[in-house]
């Protein structure tokens, strides 16, 4: 008789008041469905805090809440580089997680690939390992960022180019049986990676819990405001947006355009921007913002110029406020916004001219641009995240 299917769901993130942080949100809703189907062993998260779930769940360790607190306090004084601190947390999670694997488990579903010890123990027990990554394949990101660093003459190491972290990923990922590519950049990059695991295409998005709003018709004014919001590192591609902006502002016909750059900027890329774009006109660097909804509602257009980005939430937030989006073909959120009547323009990466052309078109076609924003909101509002979770649960129940 076949062993009864029992699934453990694993997320590196922690629980929140309503579900989970980051990709733990997907794990939470999937665990809920698997529990209803009688398939769930438990949901393992980094920390539960004071939160409980309507299904079996456990922190990776009874001490995790405390060691995370102590690590963060300690790091305030030691100032460990963020990429080393991240790897330390990942290895600690992996160490404790291996002891959470249950004897009757047949399948592990995880959104975290950095689990070498856990995966090794699972393989020795004949457990099938399924990964649904929230980001594209790490070696692909490494190559993109390394190429860009070379182009910009940047030598600083970060989480994407830290060799020890990449090596840990490579050891771990080769133990995985199946990768579910839910975002186009993830599916494409894992398919091309050359591993033996099967890569399954199952497109879907984690829809944020935006508060319902009543949109008012925004008056078309002379000024046309373009926005960008991110914690800017090299792969966010801000340098290409600024190159596009130089092209645009050299044309006197575009004198009523204004570019608003919001969010913190990593010191390395800031040095590059200060050196190469200090003479730009009609641009404001606002730094971190406290009121993202107000910021989005002040815009006529939003740009996501990322070299690679799994699912930029800012693009979906712009869509929530009916702001049309220019987004690269290496950013997963474009797949959702371009469904039906498209609410975005999808452009190639590293193409300043394409960015400039789309901004200029939007500037000269205001009403059509506003309709694109309404399309974006429609595509977001009518998208069913529940159907996506059900599709994953069906796959785990019947095909995994």
Where are the language model's segments positioned?
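Acceptor-binding helix/loop patch of EC 2.4 sugar-transfer enzymes
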Residues: 72-83, 129-167
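Donor nucleotide-sugar binding/catalytic pocket of nucleotide-sugar-dependent glycosyltransferases
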Residues: 150-213
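Glycosyltransferase donor-sugar binding loop
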Residues: 229, 239-242, 257-271
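Nucleotide-activated donor-binding/catalytic signature segment of Leloir-type glycosyltransferases, i.e.
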Residues: 270-289
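Aromatic "clamp/platform" in nucleotide-sugar-dependent glycosyltransferases that forms part
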Residues: 307
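Short hydrophobic beta-strand element within catalytic cores of glycosyltransferases
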Residues: 324-328
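Conserved acidic donor-binding segment of nucleotide-sugar-dependent glycosyltransferases
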Residues: 339-340, 344-352, 361-366
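A short, well-ordered alpha-helix in the C-terminal region of glycosyltransferases
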Residues: 361, 368-382, 394
């Amino acid at each position: 008789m076949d062993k009864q299917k029992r699934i453990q769901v694993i997320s590196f993130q922690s629980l929140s008041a309503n579900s989970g942080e980051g990709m733990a949100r997907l794990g939470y809703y999937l665990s809920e469905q698997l529990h209803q189907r009688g398939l769930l062993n438990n949901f393992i998260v980094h920390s539960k805090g004071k939160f409980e779930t309507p299904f079996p769940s456990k922190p990776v360790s009874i001490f995790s809440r405390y060691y995370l607190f102590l690590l963060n306090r300690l790091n305030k004084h030691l100032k460990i580089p963020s990429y080393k601190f991240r790897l330390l947390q990942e290895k600690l999670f992996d160490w404790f997680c291996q002891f959470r694997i249950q004897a009757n488990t047949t399948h592990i579903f995880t959104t975290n690939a950095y689990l070498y010890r856990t995966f090794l123990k699972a393989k020795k027990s004949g457990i099938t390992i399924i990964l649904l990554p929230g980001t594209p394949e790490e070696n692909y990101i490494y190559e993109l960022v390394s190429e860009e660093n070379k182009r910009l003459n940047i030598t600083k190491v970060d989480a994407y180019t830290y060799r020890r972290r990449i090596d840990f990923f490579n050891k771990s990922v080769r133990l995985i049986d199946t990768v579910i590519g839910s975002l186009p950049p993830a599916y494409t990059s894992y398919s091309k990676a050359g591993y033996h695991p099967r890569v399954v295409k199952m497109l879907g998005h984690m829809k944020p819990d935006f508060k319902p709003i009543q949109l008012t018709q925004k008056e078309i004014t002379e000024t046309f405001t373009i926005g960008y919001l991110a914690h800017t590192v090299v792969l966010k591609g801000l340098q290409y947006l600024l190159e596009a902006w130089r092209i645009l502002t050299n044309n006197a016909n575009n004198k009523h355009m204004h570019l608003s750059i919001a969010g913190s900027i990593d010191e390395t890329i800031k040095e590059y921007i200060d050196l190469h774009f200090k003479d730009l006109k009609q641009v404001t660097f606002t730094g971190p913002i406290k009121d993202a909804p107000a910021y989005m509602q002040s815009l006529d257009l939003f740009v996501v110029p990322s070299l690679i980005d799994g699912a930029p939430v800012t693009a979906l937030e712009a869509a929530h406020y009916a702001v049309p989006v220019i987004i690269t073909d290496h950013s997963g959120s474009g797949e959702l916004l371009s469904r039906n009547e498209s609410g975005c323009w999808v452009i190639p990466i590293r193409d300043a001219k394409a960015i400039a052309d789309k901004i200029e078109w939007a500037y000269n076609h205001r009403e059509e641009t506003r309709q694109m924003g309404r399309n974006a909101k429609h595509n977001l509002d009518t998208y069913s995240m529940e159907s996506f979770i059900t599709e994953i649960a069906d796959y785990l129940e019947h095909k995994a």
